């Protein structure tokens, strides 16, 4: 599996890749029903995904990382370095979203993407990473805890005020 940044071309999001990403988002209607990020999780459009990605990339230090296996887009991570609100605390990076093609769940792609993101932060000299998991998503909470993340506090997300648990993982050397 390879992880590569999704980079706008002349300020625009490349159409063919955007179509692939929209298809990835569309497989995850169950997650988007929980998150409320789209008006109709069963009909996510390319335009809605383009806006969601543009909103993510508008934050300083934000990146969208695409995960490919055998040339196929199998996942995506939206990351932010440093984490939101880091001015008040440790300067740690943040995984804002990790999305895996729902038709390939339980194939190890989520774990592989999380590991690659962590390795990327470790290589950049970061000692820990954080994520917020929506409280209404116990499967995601179980996934992240299985990856070694521990709950550190309860919070409301900045976008929609949804209840979530902030989790953190120390990134060991090597």
Identify the function of each model-found stretch.
Residues 108:
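Glycine-rich phosphate-binding loop
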Residues 111:
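Residues forming the Rossmann-fold NAD(P)(H) cofactor-binding site
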Residues 121-132:
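Conserved GNAT acetyl-CoA-binding A-motif
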Residues 145-154:
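Conserved acetyl-CoA-binding loop of GNAT-fold acetyltransferases
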Residues 161-174:
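Terminal substrate-recognition subdomain of acyl/acetyltransferases
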């Amino acid at each position: 599996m390879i992880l590569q940044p999704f980079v706008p071309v002349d300020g625009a999001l490349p159409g063919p890749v955007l179509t692939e990403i929209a298809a990835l988002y569309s497989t995850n209607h169950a997650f988007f029903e929980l998150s409320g990020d789209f008006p109709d999780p069963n009909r996510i459009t390319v335009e809605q995904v383009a806006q969601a990605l543009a909103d993510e990339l508008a934050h300083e230090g934000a990146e969208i990382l695409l995960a490919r296996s055998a040339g196929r887009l199998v996942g995506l991570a939206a990351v932010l370095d440093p984490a939101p609100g880091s001015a008040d605390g440790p300067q740690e990076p943040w995984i804002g979203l990790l999305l895996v093609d729902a038709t390939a769940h339980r194939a190890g792609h989520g774990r592989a993407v999380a590991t690659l993101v962590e390795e990327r932060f470790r290589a950049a000299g970061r000692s820990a990473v954080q994520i917020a998991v929506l409280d209404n998503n116990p499967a995601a909470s179980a996934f992240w805890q299985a990856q070694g993340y521990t709950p550190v506090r309860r919070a409301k997300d900045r976008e929609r005020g949804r209840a979530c648990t902030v989790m953190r993982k120390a990134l060991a050397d090597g």
